[in-house]
Design a protein with these regions (language model features):
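C-terminal motif of bacterial Sec signal peptides marking the signal peptidase cleavage site
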Residues: 2-4
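Non-heme di-metal
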Residues: 6-235
Length: 235
């Protein structure tokens, strides 16, 4: 779906166009990104009544608010993990925070393209223990990948809003990666194996895709060349 939307992305310089070449994903602890296309198609096919552009704008505004809040919250969770002596988990939250910011900026770019007003967001959240923060993150990601983004993607697809589909799919697929990483981190924390977690992450600047291992030549979601990736090394 995303590669077929590439020509539309070129019309909006704020939403980076994926490189149109075939790429594969690699590395342990990540989901199979090729199979995620089937999930996206399934989500798109569940649209009920025909959505209007107003519905899509509302969805994008909600997604922008959610991603902006998540970015700020994960940054705070990173600081808390560092304070509690879990630098590896602090790194994960720092990477996730940067990734969510990419999603927020993509959603914002589409809203601007649609002539919509950008919401003013004042993030509110509660910082607890690192274990509780991980559980909160897992709950949030689970909601986004099981309910929120599938619904938003279906609405955008029903009116063929291509830029919205690109931005929403980027976030939807990346959040699946984040949930895997959070599940892995929580299991490591509960089994006293935190030091086995990665201390460096690689982010795709186009879609926010997050790798805890050396990434492949191209992003498994947007096909962006990994030479452009953002490396997160210090919390």
């Amino acid at each position: 779906l995303l590669t077929s939307c590439g020509s539309n992305a070129e019309k909006n310089p704020k939403l980076q166009d994926p490189t149109a070449q075939t790429g594969t994903n690699a590395g342990p602890g990540v989901v199979n990104e090729k199979e995620e296309d089937e999930a996206s198609e399934k989500a798109g096919g569940n649209a009920g009544a025909a959505s209007t552009q107003e519905t899509v704008i509302t969805n994008l505004s909600d997604a922008f608010t959610g991603e902006t809040t998540a970015s700020a919250k994960y940054a705070a969770y990173s600081k808390k993990a560092q304070e509690e002596g879990f630098p590896q988990i602090a790194m994960l939250f720092k990477a996730a925070s940067a990734s969510e910011n990419i999603h927020a900026n993509n959603h914002k770019a589409v809203l601007e393209d649609l002539g919509a007003t950008i919401p003013v967001v004042k993030p509110t959240y509660t910082v607890k223990t690192t274990q509780e923060n991980l559980q909160d993150a897992i709950t949030g990601e689970s909601y986004e990948i099981s309910t929120m983004y599938p619904e938003f993607i279906a609405n955008a697809k029903s009116i063929n809003s291509q830029l919205a589909l690109i931005s929403l799919n980027y976030a939807y697929k990346t959040e699946q990666k984040h949930k895997v990483l959070y599940d892995k981190a929580l299991a490591a924390l509960q089994s006293n194996q935190v030091k086995t977690l990665s201390m460096q992450y690689y982010l795709c600047p186009t879609c926010g895709n997050t790798y805890d291992v050396m990434p492949p030549k191209r992003c498994g979601i947007s096909m962006t060349n990994s030479e452009k990736f953002i490396q997160i090394e210090k919390a």
